């Protein structure tokens, strides 16, 4: 007996299906089903994952593509796709139903179903009186492709329901098929299905009533059980229907947009013409012969693989940005392409890095090329709307991102469904260390009071584990566009995104890659925004027009590199983290390629592969550089015999083990997923044998494989690092030569980067930049530059810092400000007409120029008469609040209202008040010996817990002389959890460690001093 499951919902039927699509197809294959249809509700979001699993595991089971729908909450149908036309038809129906409704819901119309010409229709009667109407209606429109589908779940009314369905089928003269209405791959998922249903209905499992499944019969069931439940002919009918469904997802073929080709050109000739023009601009002194040859090789491969439309599409998008003055930069593997460089998609000169085109495009790699282009954060929307306008909503949409349950949401939702008090759930979430949330959280929650021996405690742990990774909803990808030649909804359904004027498809980037479908990544980068604003300020105040290309043309300024070697990189792109700052004085970058290495070396790949210390020792002359062969030397010479980049690992496999370019790229893909899939192991014999056959000893081969495994943690491509190094150098150059403009641009681009506005302001002042407070007569919404009496430019802080004060109010205040400025708070009140806005400005001390202090300003703001139009003519009382706020009170108010203070540092005030015990300042640490005991104190401005740091957290403490690096080991953190997690002002007793110019403190004792300034509103930036 054979059977095909024709109605099966995965967890992409959100809060209904209790299994992943991958689990469903694996279990169905284990049961030896003939076929399985993944039929999520008005969705195909799970079908590609099922397809990829069948392909990966070479399963002997057929996949059917379909979807389930409700019409008017009375008629339930499943559509199945027998052919490509049927699939396009179903996608159109899903798109129409989704687009006419809000995100997360759909509205199917009778016309949608009446328009069906190719899909097979399974009708699932609801055992209601309306079944007779809907049966006749469906029969009228789909007589030759309609089945009555019977589900038997062994409930109390099964026999009555079956008789009802059989009568309907007889009346309509339509065949019957068996189907399971499957929601889970095994019966063990029933408790999770109950949890999902409870979440859906906003109640606990105990309150579900009849919404709760009475048994586990909606799991996939073995054939020997099905034959006892269904008539043989019904099971055979399911196989017959499955055999009608010949459509496969692999039949989908992507068609690129074609309208970019001018008359008289073919796609290939037009691309070649653009490349020829571009190479003349890129190489004005003449194109080197090897570059010409590389271009020819790339163009030939692009033509063979028919990717020319893709390159032309990207070129069109970046040319639009260029014409509009929007800064952009291509990055990632595209930097391995000289064609991309000539088309001005990327900014990295191929002569500066080791180009590996196989990393970008390979005949043996079954995936399209991937070009990531970053645009200014604030202007990317212009690019997105250009794409929509050029290609139309019917041909362009963003890829989806699957938002899944993670620790926090899983604990909260599962706990509520089990009836656990919300206060206890909040306590768990708050006190479980962030770095342990992926693993090890169970033990921590038990320590926090969960009773593991209780039934509820056991259920909680099991169900949280099961639901983590389950999809919650579809969101929009950060910028991955799918653009097609014809209607996109014939390829994949399109639905509304949460953001206005955005639409998304129902597949994510992994789905697109599995089906070899193209996406164009239109991404946002805050640093490009900051650089553009900095250029504008420089042009305004110095009449100098700059560009990234001009700054990075030479990339050899010794002043800039000396600044980097001192780790003076707050605000500098990619090298501003504490880990990067610790590495800079050790690596001492002195040229552009050093920066490329610097960015890549502080990554999990090189660290896990134990490549950092050997590289530094060789660079410093402490260890000899040697190569086992000239072939290996050609790959590793630029990094002193140590593989730092992904491309080097790929090249090593090619030159030392005989891998082809495509095989080496498959190795790269396996590296990226080896922890998840264990795919690297299959390459080990070929790698070891290939290297030994070429004369390399086994120890060397084993070491290379271990390094490859290290890269599997997260190897950084040279091309990616090279693209980032361009912006790193540019931002460093701007910081050195134009600090006032640089910090103003950064502050106007927040939020971005590692540092808060408070930290940026403190760093600006340490660099001699005068920063002026928010002022009702001098500030604008944005921060701006003003000429100071000493001839230098100072930063005038803007209203954007005032918490709760919006841009609309600030704009009105500035536009109506007299040339001589406001003379009283009453004038301002007449313009803003909002007591709340006046109070916000008063709290930020923006009225100091009018009132002397914020207390007087707040007193004036409390005058209720002037809020009434009848009393606007009454003059403000002249009696003010005569008590001056203390420096301490001003500090508290500053942080509460703006997040920063230009007054003296909190640590200075605490020390002067005699509150803090004796401690060592940051500037004094340079005089301390290695391994000496020290006590430091400061405001906690950052906590970083990198995934590769083996349980280490890096704290940044800011005192009144600078930033202190503190290393907190996991044992110390666990023993002093409260101080570790919640301190805003922290004193640390520990051991000073020094390596060259790098100084940090290994924490021993953590002392929370927050209560000394209990109202301080300074927030640290925590990165995990």
Curated annotation (Swiss-Prot):
Location within or outside the cell: Cytoplasm
Q: What is its EC number?
A: 2.7.7.7
Q: What is this protein called?
A: Error-prone DNA polymerase
Signal peptide positions on this chain: none
The record's listing under PANTHER family reads: DNA POLYMERASE III SUBUNIT ALPHA, ERROR-PRONE DNA POLYMERASE
What's the catalysed reaction? Answer: DNA(n) + a 2'-deoxyribonucleoside 5'-triphosphate = DNA(n+1) + diphosphate
Family the UniProt entry places it in: Belongs to the DNA polymerase type-C family. DnaE2 subfamily.
- GO MF annotations, alphabetized: 3'-5' exonuclease activity; DNA-directed DNA polymerase activity; nucleic acid binding
UniProt organism field? Vibrio parahaemolyticus serotype O3:K6 (strain RIMD 2210633)
Q: Which UniProt keywords apply?
A: Cytoplasm, DNA damage, DNA repair, DNA replication, DNA-directed DNA polymerase, Nucleotidyltransferase, Transferase
Tell me one GO biological process term: DNA repair
What is the top-level taxon of the source organism? Bacteria
Where does the UniProt entry say this protein principally localizes?
cytoplasm
Top-level EC class? transferase
Any one GO CC term of the record: cytoplasm
What is this protein for, i.e. what is its function?
DNA polymerase involved in damage-induced mutagenesis and translesion synthesis (TLS). It is not the major replicative DNA polymerase.
Among Gene3D superfamilies, the record links this protein to: 1.10.150.870, Metal-dependent hydrolases, Nucleic acid-binding proteins
């Amino acid at each position: 007996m054979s059977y095909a499951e024709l109605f099966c919902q995965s967890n992409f039927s959100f809060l209904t299906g209790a299994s992943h699509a991958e689990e469903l197809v694996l279990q169905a294959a284990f049961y030896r089903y003939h076929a399985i249809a993944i039929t999520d509700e008005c969705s195909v979001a799970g079908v590609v994952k099922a397809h990829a699993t069948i392909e990966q595991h070479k399963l002997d089971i057929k996949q059917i593509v379909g979807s389930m729908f409700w019409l008017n909450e009375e008629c339930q149908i499943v559509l199945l796709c027998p052919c490509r036309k049927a699939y396009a038809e179903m996608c159109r129906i899903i798109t129409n139903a989704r687009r006419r409704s809000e995100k997360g819901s759909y509205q199917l119309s009778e016309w949608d179903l009446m328009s069906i010409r190719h899909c097979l229709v399974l009708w699932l009667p609801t055992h209601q009186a309306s079944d007779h109407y809907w049966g006749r209606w469906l029969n009228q429109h789909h007589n030759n492709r309609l089945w009555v589908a019977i589900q038997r779940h062994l409930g109390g009314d099964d026999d009555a329901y079956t008789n009802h369905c059989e009568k309907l089928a007889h009346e309509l003269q339509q065949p019957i098929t068996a189907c399971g209405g499957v929601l889970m791959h095994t019966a063990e998922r029933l408790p999770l299905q109950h949890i999902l249903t409870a979440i859906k209905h906003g109640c606990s499992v105990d309150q579900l009533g009849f919404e709760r499944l009475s048994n586990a019969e909606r799991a996939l069931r073995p054939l020997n059980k099905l034959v006892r439940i269904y008539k043989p002919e019904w099971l055979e009918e399911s196989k017959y229907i499955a055999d009608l469904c010949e459509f496969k997802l692999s039949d989908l073929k992507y068609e690129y947009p074609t309208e970019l080709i001018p008359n008289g050109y073919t796609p290939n000739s037009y691309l070649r013409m653009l490349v020829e023009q571009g190479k003349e601009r890129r190489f004005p002194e003449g194109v080197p012969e090897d570059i010409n040859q590389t271009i020819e090789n790339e163009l030939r491969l692009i033509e063979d693989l028919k990717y020319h439309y893709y390159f032309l599409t990207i070129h069109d998008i970046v040319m639009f940005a260029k014409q509009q003055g929007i800064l952009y930069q291509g990055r990632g593997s595209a930097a391995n392409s000289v064609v991309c460089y000539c088309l001005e998609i990327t900014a990295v000169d191929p002569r500066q890095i080791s180009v590996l085109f196989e990393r970008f495009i390979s005949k043996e790699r079954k995936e399209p090329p991937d070009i990531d282009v970053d645009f200014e954060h604030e202007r990317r929307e212009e690019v997105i709307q250009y794409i929509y306008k050029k290609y139309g909503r019917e041909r362009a949409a963003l890829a989806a991102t699957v938002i899944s349950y993670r620790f926090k949401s899983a604990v909260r939702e599962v706990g509520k469904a089990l009836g656990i008090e919300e206060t206890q759930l909040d306590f768990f979430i708050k006190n479980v260390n962030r770095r342990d949330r992926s693993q090890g959280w169970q033990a921590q929650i038990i320590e926090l009071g969960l009773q593991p021996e209780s039934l509820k405690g056991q259920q909680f742990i099991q169900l949280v584990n099961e639901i983590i990774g389950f999809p919650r909803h579809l969101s929009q990808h950060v910028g991955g566009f799918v653009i097609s030649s014809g209607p996109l909804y014939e390829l994949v359904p399109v639905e509304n995104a949460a953001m206005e004027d955005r639409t998304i498809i129902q597949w994510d980037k992994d789905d697109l890659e599995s089906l070899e479908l193209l996406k164009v990544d239109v991404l946002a980068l805050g640093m490009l925004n900051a650089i553009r604003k900095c250029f504008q300020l420089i042009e305004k105040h110095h009449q100098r027009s700059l560009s990234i290309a001009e700054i990075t043309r030479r990339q050899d300024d010794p002043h800039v590199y000396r600044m980097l070697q001192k780790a003076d990189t707050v605000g500098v792109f990619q090298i501003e983290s504490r880990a990067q700052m610790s590495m800079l004085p050790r690596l001492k970058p002195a040229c552009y390629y050093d920066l490329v290495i610097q960015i890549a070396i502080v990554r999990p790949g090189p660290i896990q592969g134990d490549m950092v210390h050997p590289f530094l020792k060789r660079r410093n002359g402490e260890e000899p550089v040697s190569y086992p062969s000239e072939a290996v030397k050609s790959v590793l010479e630029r990094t002193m015999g140590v593989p730092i980049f992904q491309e080097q690992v790929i090249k090593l496999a090619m030159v030392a083990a005989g891998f082809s370019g495509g095989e080496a790229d498959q190795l790269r893909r396996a590296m990226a997923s080896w922890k998840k899939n264990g795919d690297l192991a299959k390459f080990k014999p070929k790698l070891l044998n290939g290297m030994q056959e070429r004369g390399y000893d086994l120890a060397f081969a084993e070491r290379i494989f271990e390094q490859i495994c290290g890269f599997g943690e997260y190897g950084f491509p040279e091309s990616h690092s090279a693209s980032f190094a361009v912006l790193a150098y540019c931002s460093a150059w701007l910081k050195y030569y134009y600090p006032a403009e640089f910090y103003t641009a950064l502050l106007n681009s927040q939020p971005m980067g590692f540092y808060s506005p408070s930290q940026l302001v403190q760093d600006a002042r340490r660099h001699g930049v005068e920063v002026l407070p928010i002022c009702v007569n001098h500030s604008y919404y944005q921060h701006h530059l003003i000429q100071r009496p000493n001839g230098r430019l100072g930063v005038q802080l803007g209203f954007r810092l005032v918490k709760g004060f919006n841009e609309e109010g600030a704009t009105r205040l500035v536009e109506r400000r007299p040339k001589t400025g406001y003379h009283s708070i009453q004038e301002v009140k007449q313009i803003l007409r909002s007591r709340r806005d006046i109070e916000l400005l008063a709290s930020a001390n923006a009225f100091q120029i009018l009132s002397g202090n914020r207390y007087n300003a707040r007193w004036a703001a409390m005058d209720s008469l002037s809020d009434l139009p009848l009393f606007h003519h009454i003059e403000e009382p002249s009696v003010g609040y005569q008590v001056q706020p203390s420096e301490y009170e001003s500090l508290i108010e500053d942080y509460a209202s703006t997040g920063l203070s230009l007054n003296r540092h909190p640590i200075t005030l605490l020390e002067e008040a005699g509150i803090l015990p004796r401690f060592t300042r940051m500037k004094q640490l340079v005089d301390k010996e290695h391994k000496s005991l020290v006590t430091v104190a400061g405001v906690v401005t950052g906590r970083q817990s990198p995934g590769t740091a083996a349980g280490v957290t890096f704290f940044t403490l800011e005192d009144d002389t600078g930033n202190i690096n503190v290393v907190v080991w996991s044992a110390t953190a666990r023993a002093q959890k409260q101080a570790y997690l919640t301190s805003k002002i922290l004193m640390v007793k520990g051991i000073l460690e020094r390596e060259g110019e790098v100084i940090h403190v290994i924490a021993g004792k953590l002392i929370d001093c927050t209560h000394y300034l209990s109202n301080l509103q300074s927030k640290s930036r925590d990165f995990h």
